[in-house]
Amino acid sequence: MVLISMSAVAQNKPFYNEVHEFQKKDSISMPASNGIVFIGSSSLRMWTDLEETFKSYHAINRGFGGSELTNANDWIKELVLVYKPRQVVIYSGENDVASGASSAQTFDRFVTFFSNLRRNLPKAKITYISMKLSPSRAQFSDVILKANASIKEYLLKQKNADYIDIAAKMLDSKGGYRPELFQDDMLHMKPAGYEIWTKEITPYLTKK
């Protein structure tokens, strides 16, 4: 009865189907422990060659589209802890802001998730990729930048943690958007955008 009840609760959580697909994949071939888990929203989910790009680091892509920091925290056991990673790389928060969360609320959600990760994975490195600025979400840029700044300041005070400023790297010399980096929706990235991400993220990844 307990197992049935727990399953029913899980099925009522947002993104159950996406998480279940990951679990089905793992049942066929479970990733080795001590890898690097990438968790977050669609910018990771749509990075289809992420695991191949970072193959030598034993990367595990657990991005699920449309997710917020609260969702990542809700599924922390199934999408992060189960893999016993040596490092966790987070890209999340953008959807929180787009859904109406303030910079302070987004920051608080990040701290909750970070604290949960740290409590369960005391030796793991935790790395946060800053929220990007995209043309389709220009109205949220101030909130995103404030949340990014708060997260950066927080992580500078934490041990074994990093902040990667991806937002600035995706702007032109005048601080404007670079539409050529984005798909037609002006939100999700083309390969050129992911090339920037690869260049900026790689130095922060830990080898075994």
Where do the language-model regions lie?
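Catalytic His-Asp segment of secreted/periplasmic serine-dependent ester chemistry enzymes
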Residues: V2, P135-K208
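Conserved beta-strand elements of the Class I
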Residues: V37-I39, I60
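N-terminal secretory targeting modules
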Residues: M1-V37, L44, T48, E52, ...
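A short helix->loop->beta-strand "cap" motif at the edges of active sites that frequently abuts
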Residues: L121-K125
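Oxyanion-hole/transition-state-stabilizing segment in secreted/luminal serine hydrolases
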Residues: L44-I60, L69-F107, T127, M131-P135
